Amino acid sequence: MVQRQQTALVGTHDGGIRLSSTETIPDIAGDSVLIKTKAVSVNPVDTKMIGPYVTPGAVAGFDFAGVVEMVGPDATKCDIRVGDRVCTAIMGMNPLDPTVGAFAEYTAAVEWILLKIPPSLSFQEGASLGISFMTTGLALFKSLGLPGNPLSPATEKLPVLVYGGSSATGTAAIQLVRLAGFAPITTCSPRNFELVKSYGASAVFDYNDPNCISDIKKHTKNNIRYALDCISTTQSMQFCYQAIGRAGGKYTALEPYSEAVARTRKMVKPDWIMGPQMLGKEIRWPEPHWRPANAEMGEFGVYWTAVLNKLLENDLIRPHAIVVREGGLEKVLDGIEDIRAKKISGKKLVFTL
């Protein structure tokens, strides 16, 4: 490979992000893999990479899809080869690995976190999968600890509450909950009822209906033990806490949760997770998002990526609806602002590179 420098979106000294054409292409060693980026998606987490979360010169971005360009000498366990179409979520804006991020012409990832894109999906669809399915897998099968998994379904069809079912993480969670043998109970606005049902929701409720919680309790016989909060606000946490059955259970959010709400029910165990934890490495972002290295999380990442690859291979999961824009990395900056301004609703924003 002759090219030494690349174009990427990188952190600035004043806590922002800019387009640079003189960035270093990641070095490939050990079990890492170099990927030529073909498409990226913009997520809410990208809007939060500002101020103290920015490392000057670090490449931004999490979700990508592309073609394998080079394979490290120790990347021999996952049958990843030059020319493979792959996607995943990595940790952009990483002070410990600043040359690696999704918003670049080339990026890198360890072999065991890569998802092979099946022939039925485009690069653009592949770029929308990583954060949604990685994060929900961690939430459902590690944090909540659902018995069973999509490849070995549970024998008891327990109800699992997915709050915010029409979001990208929501539709991913609904599919995984159903495949794992559970009954996905979800909430969204009435205009999205048919959408979430198409992804496998067994029952859907209007979260704005004043009788919503009582209707959920009636439908589930007051037996919800597990709740995944894809919206993760104080209000959504209060809703989930009230919907969880009398015996208590587990609640997992995708953002730091309210300690005040957590104290209202001692029989409910709260947790919150971040997708990059699955890499098993230290997350050196400011509190409360700092995490120490955790080998157990890395082991789960290996396991869960293998599960997802099997699900993709057999066409058992499908991506959230996407809206595709052209214009490359320069336009990604506009996309981040559109996500921040909530101009994109009900779809994942994807850019072709």
Swiss-Prot record:
NADP(+) binds at residues 45-48, 166-169, 189-192, 207, 254-255, 344-345. It comes from the Eukaryota. It is an enzyme of class 1 (oxidoreductase). One of its GO terms (molecular function) is oxidoreductase activity, acting on NAD(P)H. It holds the Pfam family ADH_N. CDD domains: enoyl_reductase_like. Keywords: NADP, Nucleotide-binding, Oxidoreductase. InterPro entries: ADH-like_C, ADH-like_N, GroES-like_sf, NAD(P)-bd_dom_sf, PKS_ER, Trans-enoyl_RdTase-like. Substrate binds at residues 131-138, 275-279. Pathway: Mycotoxin biosynthesis. The keyword Coiled coil does not apply. It catalyses: L-serine + 7 malonyl-CoA + acetyl-CoA + 2 S-adenosyl-L-methionine + ATP + 8 NADPH + 11 H(+) = (5S)-3-[(2E,6R,8E,10E,12E)-2,6-dimethyltetradeca-2,8,10,12-tetraenoyl]-5-(hydroxymethyl)pyrrolidine-2,4-dione + AMP + 2 S-adenosyl-L-homocysteine + 7 CO2 + diphosphate + 8 NADP(+) + 8 CoA + 6 H2O. Disruption phenotype: Abolishes the production of equisetin and accumulates the intermediate trichosetin. Its EC number is 1.-.-.-. Trans-enoyl reductase; part of the gene cluster that mediates the biosynthesis of equisetin, a trans-fused decalin-containing tetramic acid with antimicrobial activity. The PKS module of eqxS together with the enoylreductase eqxC catalyze the formation of the polyketide unit which is then conjugated to L-serine by the condensation domain of the eqxS NRPS module. Activity of the Dieckmann cyclase domain (RED) results in release of the Dieckmann product intermediate. Monomer. PANTHER family: HYPOTHETICAL OXIDOREDUCTASE (EUROFUNG), TRANS-ENOYL REDUCTASE STHE. This is Trans-enoyl reductase eqxC. It comes from Fusarium heterosporum. The gene is eqxC.
